[in-house]
Amino acid sequence: MQDSVMQRMWNSAHLSGGNAAYVEELYELYLHDPNAVPEEWRTYFEKLPAEAGTSTDVPHAPVRDQFVLLAKNQRRAQPVATSSVSTEHEKKQVEVLRLIQAYRTRGHQASQLDPLGLWQRTAPSDLSITHYGLTNADLDTPFRTGELYIGKEEATLREILQALQETYCRTIGAEFTHIVDSEQRNWFAQRLESVRGRPVYSKEAKSHLLERLSAAEGLEKYLGTKYPGTKRFGLEGGESLVPVVDEIIQRSGSYGTKEVVIGMAHRGRLNLLVNALGKNPRDLFDEFEGKHLVELGSGDVKYHQGFSSNVMTSGGEVHLAMAFNPSHLEIVSPVVEGSVRARQDRRVDATGEKVVPISIHGDSAFAGQGVVMETFQMSQIRGYKTGGTIHIVVNNQVGFTTSNPVDTRSTEYCTDPAKMIQAPVLHVNGDDPEAVLFVTQLAVDYRMQFKRDVVIDLVCYRRRGHNEADEPSGTQPLMYQKIAKQPTTRELYADALVKEGSLSQEEVQAKVDEYRTALDNGQHVLKSLVKEPNTELFVDWTPYLGHAWTARHDTSFELKTLQELNAKLLQIPEGFVVQRQVAKILEDRGRMGVGAMPINWGCAETLAYATLLKEGHPVRITGQDVGRGTFSHRHAALHNQKDASRYIPLQNLYEGQPKFELYDSFLSEEAVLAFEYGYATTTPNALVIWEASSGDFANGAQVVIDQFISSGETKWGALCGLTMLLPHGYEGQGPEHSSARLERYLQLCAEQNIQVCVPTTPAQVYHMLRRQVIRPLRKPLVALTPKSLLRHKSAISTLEDLALGSFHPVLPEVDSLDPKKVERLVLCSGKVYYDLLDKRHAEGREDIAIVRIEQLYPFPEEELAEVMAPYTNLKHVVWCQEEPMNQGAWYCSQHHMRRVASAHKKELFLQYAGREASAAPACGYASMHAEQQEKLLQDAFTV
């Protein structure tokens, strides 16, 4: 009898009974996907008889049905050891798939990113086929491509290798496999591999790309010729930045974006202002020539100035804003995020597609500045996220004079900090403009689809020194020998386009000549610039311009409505269970609202917010622990003890009310304060508050205070109504929890730049907060708020104080003293007032008056003189403070007080009562604190 097919297979070595389980597994795989098994097995399985016939073979239909059932139930027979059953080809197939993954993960380490060719990098061994047991003999062997997106399910190893090397090892180095989300990883693999990292662009796109490079290079050459040696921090060597920003703007516009906010440092800033934002070159030339363009204030150097304009895109008009920035690197990034969040809130842009942030960094600063990490940490936090930021690192491989990576970072790339939030990083050779264009398009598309940060690492070089007066070859001799021979990016790309026939040499030169002519004529050189922009895209600051400190304002509020708001704040959803102590606080506030109890600090502050919301002003409060308040006084957010849900009464006052935002911030001072500064500079009609958990910690954001809050208006004309609440007070808690460093803020005071207040009653803080918004003046407010006074029996106010009163820069004597008997006047601010008052009452003194200065800057000299006027028999005037002599208000404010005292009576001399000068803000021992406190109080009455 003729042997059946099955009999012959039984007789073969690899289909012995011991391999039956393996065959079953192959067949099950075949039933699930015929293409998933090797070709010879697929051919065999296809020829198996479907049902019993004349063949002597055992009928296979029932067996097949059984296998189908096995496949459906996902039961896997256990094969014997793989080594004994897997064919050599199958083993190699697995290794090929590992090779593909290795290129996705480490291909960037073999990519050609450095235009200068100075990077000395050894290609990873796991990108070699020999690492996987493959040889050149396997190059023409076909393998399944798995999830490799090259349009073929099967390809030779040679084809697979070529696709991988072209995709991942040319002038683009993509890092995306560190992303946890598989959808995002697959998205990048598909976008990169489907075009092998190099899409084909039209002649029009290539021509536009060359035009942008010609503009970038043309401006630098023009300025270098017209103003030789003048600092401009040029973009030479990194000209590809201009087409990057241009493409981000245009492509974002196609998604419906209405605003783009850009933050960057000095390098290339002037070039972007002219070539991306459309600043008139004539205005830039005036700045180079030192013409005084700022009517008031100190002004700032040209490469710190901000700018705004409108450009046209395929999706309509887009408003562009370049943020003002200081020389402190990277600090502008969180400012931009705050500005973007404010614009998104104004547009009710929940998805973040209407307003897009761009942050442009230097390589050394990106790796070195801690605020970079803080800003990244914001990216997905609900109080700060903006739908993803597009980061561009202008990686010119040198920071001033430092270029050796062993000196600039401990990571492989300068961009590695971005991996903390799983941001994809697209490294690209700046001398390959089409690769630059492609990664830019990828970055925009990724941001728009996944609403997350993305980083473009534009690897380039710096053709000149740190500035144009600097000679870099002294510290980077080899680098600058190479740069001297390096053609410009425009020259390289122009030659390539001419060679491929996309443009003629005449067309290339015409772009250069056209740009030069426009500069000579002082014309706008940005063709997409909108000459008559839509003003609805701008933030309207008109109502807040030109006001003096004396601008009239009324912070009173109708009593009945005030009581109604207080009652509304106490309404809690049914079934919502608050903590016992919180319930007692709310119960007390209910009594305060009907006049049965005096108003305390927490009640007055909350009512200030409620009344502003009622009058149409948004309120935003952030900081560590602001919902409850560091010292448990606010309780603006209530927490259900049953299910931990949160309820914010201030968000539920009435239908259609303005937005009330309350966010406990992450543990950052610098980035968070910078964010709120950016938010406040973009939302003039809102009360924007940052509260420090303790005022001592605000100096973690000193750069923001020095470079933006105190000086932004005089440098850039940038108005800002940000409020800083800084808990301050000496209660024996040691040097880290006593002082908000009042002296530092007062030292910064000049030209009526900020306001510094130290309120001591609930009514004062109520009217101070309302004044900050109701008065049309927009100046930062630094308020030193109390700790122990939050529950002090004497730090109280009445409903009438809130409804009918106003903020008083100077609070007069509270007791009914006979002015003629008063021989000593004690001036003070803050908590020490209540200690002085208690001491005077205890001693029964009627010859001492105590006056509080609640606003230390601008100093209220007229109000103080008015309060002092009745005391015609004064012999002593004393300033009393809790802080050491070298701290607090003494040194910065004494000249104001002396002037008022001498005007009152020429022989009066201002005396000091307070702690002795100290290197630390406060002592760490409770007993010593008590001794010092008693002495300064005694000095106030006797010195």
From Swiss-Prot:
The answer to keyword Oxidoreductase applying to this record is: yes
Do you know which PANTHER family this protein is assigned to? 2-OXOADIPATE DEHYDROGENASE COMPLEX COMPONENT E1 (PTHR23152:SF4), 2-OXOGLUTARATE DEHYDROGENASE (PTHR23152)
GO terms in the biological process aspect are: glycolytic process; tricarboxylic acid cycle
- Record-annotated disulphide pairs: none
Entry's EC annotation: 1.2.4.2
Q: Which SMART domains match?
A: Transket_pyr (SM00861)
Q: How does it assemble?
A: Homodimer. Part of the 2-oxoglutarate dehydrogenase (OGDH) complex composed of E1 (2-oxoglutarate dehydrogenase), E2 (dihydrolipoamide succinyltransferase) and E3 (dihydrolipoamide dehydrogenase); the complex contains multiple copies of the three enzymatic components (E1, E2 and E3).
This protein's cofactor list reads:
thiamine diphosphate
Q: What does this protein do?
A: E1 component of the 2-oxoglutarate dehydrogenase (OGDH) complex which catalyzes the decarboxylation of 2-oxoglutarate, the first step in the conversion of 2-oxoglutarate to succinyl-CoA and CO(2).
Write down the Pfam families for this protein, in alphabetical order. Answer: 2-oxogl_dehyd_N (PF16078), E1_dh (PF00676), OxoGdeHyase_C (PF16870), Transket_pyr (PF02779)
Sample GO molecular function, one term: oxoglutarate dehydrogenase (succinyl-transferring) activity
**Alphabetical UniProt keywords:** Glycolysis, Oxidoreductase, Thiamine pyrophosphate
Annotated family: Belongs to the alpha-ketoglutarate dehydrogenase family.
Q: Which reaction does it catalyse?
A: N(6)-[(R)-lipoyl]-L-lysyl-[protein] + 2-oxoglutarate + H(+) = N(6)-[(R)-S(8)-succinyldihydrolipoyl]-L-lysyl-[protein] + CO2
Q: Which InterPro entries match?
A: 2-oxogl_dehyd_N, 2oxoglutarate_DH_E1, DH_E1, KGD_C_sf, ODO-1/KGD_C, THDP-binding, Transketolase-like_Pyr-bd
**Name by which UniProt lists this protein:** 2-oxoglutarate dehydrogenase E1 component
From which source organism is this entry? Answer: Azotobacter vinelandii
Cellular component, GO annotation: cytosol; oxoglutarate dehydrogenase complex
